[in-house]
Amino acid sequence: MTYRDVASKSVLIWACTAVGSRMPVAMAPLALVFLVRERPGGYTLGAALAAAYVIGEIIGAPVLGMRLDPARGRRHLVVGLLGGAVAFAGLGVLPGAHPVVLGAFACGAGFAPSAASGGLRTLLTSLVPERAVAQALSIESMLMSGVWAVSPVAVAGLALGIAPRVPLLLAAALMAASIAGLWLLPARWDKDGPDGETGESKLRVLIRAWPVYVTGAASLTLLGLAELTLPALLEQRGIAVGWSGPMLAGLAVGAGCGAFLYGLRTWPGRLRTRSVVFMCGMSAFVALAALIPGPAGIAVALALGGTLQAGAVITRNLSLRETLPPGAIAAGYSVMYAAVGAGYAVTGSLAGTLLQVVAPSTAILAGVALGLLLTALGWWGEVRGEARAKASSTAGDAGDDTGAGLGARAEGAPVARRGDA
């Protein structure tokens, strides 16, 4: 079980496709701000467009994710990515349009391809042996860390160096190119056929996995608050705000390193236990970043926090695979994506509110407390769910034994008898 198990032409094609579909997502919020910043009230409008984009993602991920059919996976992903490419192109071609029109394009750009993340992750795990799923998810995490590290630099360079519309036109081109990549990959990800179906509605199955979503949202909520309040924290410490960029880049590098390290070996303990350990460690490092006075210490703490966050994210994705039947995994990833997006949106509001009444360091510590609370809630939910499942299984076994006994006593009786039903 090493990274050699995932080294294949299909995984390489998947990686290129994933970059094409995910880089526009990473570019979008900042690109929307640059698109309209020269208008009167441009920054306010840019923030509103970015919010419309995020709202589209949060709504679209669960709505479209629940409609993902493993047997027709490629068709669904192509339609979503095509819609996203058209919306991004509309923003780039019509930068001077009425704000309502731009808002509609922004919302559509977030909504249409929002299920692609879950679908592509499920497709990736279908391309590798079952024993190498953790390594595949580690590779995905490393890849996405790189995408999120490069995207802001690319947006700023293109918008300021060429034209504000160029990042959005590039986003449209990348998303369209990812559609071409999908045609080189399997059309479906239910390679073993439909199994694990119980007749229970997909919605109920997905709701049952709520503890995993809560813990997943907690991981990004915690680091999201640290990211958003970092410039204010540096000002509080008397450190140049310009250091925030390199520090956040270090956080992204730490996340990539953490993902690589996670895939190097099999880790002991249950998935939920590992998740709690990663979350508590990450919380400790974020708290240290809030308390350490020097820039070097803050940078190291954030990098180590990012390293542990990667482990927490991969563990949550593995937990989702363990919790859901195969036919609902892609939808589960999409719901997780929406939960994380909602958590990040709430984090932004929380950061803005807290910074008006408390010091930045206190705001970060409040975020740590919230993250630990959500982690505890998710852990409790998983323990409770497992206990219920065991109780149900025990009751079912008892019923089977009773039925078997009745059947033995009624041997030779008509089929209509209860023992033979």
Language-model-derived ranges and their functions:
Residues 1-56, 203-249:
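Helix-loop boundary and gating motifs at the non-cytosolic
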Residues 105-146:
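Cytoplasmic helix-loop-helix junction between adjacent transmembrane helices
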Residues 19, 99-115, 217, 298-311:
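Hydrophobic core of transmembrane alpha-helices in multi-pass small-molecule transporters
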Residues 59-73, 159, 257-271, 355:
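Helix-to-loop junctions at the C-terminal end of transmembrane segments
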Residues 82-97, 281-293:
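C-terminal ends and interior cores of transmembrane alpha-helices
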Residues 32, 114-128, 230, 311-324:
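Intracellular juxtamembrane helix-capping segments at the cytosolic ends
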Residues 272-313:
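C-terminal transmembrane helical hairpin of 12-TM major facilitator-type secondary transporters
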Residues 327-358:
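A late C-terminal transmembrane helix in Major Facilitator Superfamily
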